[in-house]
UniProtKB/Swiss-Prot annotation:
Biological-process GO terms, alphabetical: circadian rhythm
Protein's organism: Prochlorococcus marinus (strain MIT 9312)
Name used for this protein in its record: Circadian clock oscillator protein KaiB
Keyword Transcription: no
UniProt cross-references to Gene3D superfamilies, sorted A to Z: Glutaredoxin
Subunit structure as annotated in this protein's UniProt entry: May undergo a major conformational rearrangment; in the free state forms homooligomers. When bound to KaiC switches to a monomeric thioredoxin-fold (KaiB(fs)). The active oscillator complex is probably KaiC(6):KaiB(6).
Length: 105
């Protein structure tokens, strides 16, 4: 069996607003259910660290960025739909591919 990839993600939020907290909680739930032990999530508050938002060209929050594995993918706005998040970050395809070729046939 091939080693699972490690996923590096950044979530950009603007303070502790209800929308930011909802995005963070939903994302953590998705990651713990789907990628437990193989992800690292960095939460960046753009109000406290505006230079990071500027460097990464973040124009709206919440924004979720998958940094590794390449290619970099971003989702801006609502993160409540699990499938939308996984497809948007190009993670659902990886999940399906691993299942299809796992040799369980």
């Amino acid at each position: 069996m091939a080693a699972r990839k490690t996923y590096i993600l950044k979530l950009y939020v603007a303070g502790n607003t209800p929308n930011s907290m909802r995005a963070l909680n939903t994302l953590r739930e998705i990651l713990e259910n789907e990628f437990k032990g193989v992800y690292a999530l960095k939460v960046i508050d753009v109000l406290k660290q505006p230079q990071l938002a500027e460097e990464d060209k973040i124009l709206a929050t919440p924004t979720l960025a998958k940094i590794l594995p390449p290619p970099v993918r971003r989702i801006i706005g609502d993160l409540s739909d699990r499938e939308k998040v996984l497809i948007g970050l190009d993670l659902l395809f990886d999940e399906l591919t691993e299942t299809e070729y796992s040799g369980d046939k």
